Amino acid sequence: MEYSDFELVRGIKNGDSGALDILVRRWYPRIYGYIFKLIAHEQDAYDLTQDVFVAMMQNIQSYYPWKKFDSWLFTIAHNKCMDFFRMRKRSVPTDDIVFDHPDPAPLLEETVTISVSVKDALAKLPTPQREAIILHYFHHFTVKEIARLTNTPLPTIKSRLSTAKKTLSKYLREDF
């Protein structure tokens, strides 16, 4: 039987460690992927993902069922990433960003070239624009949800997405 996030959170609040295990297994890959795409360092992404789930447990009593669980959890992840950037005050290295690709053997050379170009273009974006693109196109959040979870005005998110798309288009035109 598949439990909803709401049912699992209710179980966690009642001390059910099995519910916690299911919820972490369900959300760990998406949270790790989001963080890794933002900070581009495997060990830091692993550590921050662990921090997100620790913070989730510490704050689970403050989660209200009328909130979307994924928005609440991604807000925690966003805040952990912003704390990381503030503490480290470093830029994201473009050479370390990795995107999952299927087995490259059947891929045509042209497809590989395009994928690498998109990865490189995305890595050149400023962090706020890259984050908006990742949340919207990789994790399928709406513009309104992105604004809420990043605590950013809706017009700013729209602007970031628009600017990022134009910039990505420019970078990709230069490559081809």
Regions found by a protein language model. Give the residues of each.
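N-terminal module of bacterial RNA polymerase sigma factors
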Residues: 1-30, 118, 123, 144-145, ...
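Internal acidic/polar
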Residues: 2-5, 91-115, 122, 142
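Conserved RNAP core-binding helix
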Residues: 8, 24, 32, 42-59
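Sigma70-family region 2
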Residues: 13-14, 53-68, 88
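Structural recognition of an alpha-helix C-terminal capping motif at a helix-to-coil junction
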Residues: 33, 47-54, 67-79
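Arg/Lys-rich amphipathic alpha helix in sigma70-family domain 2
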Residues: 61-65, 75-94, 163
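A short pre-motif secondary-structure segment
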Residues: 132-136
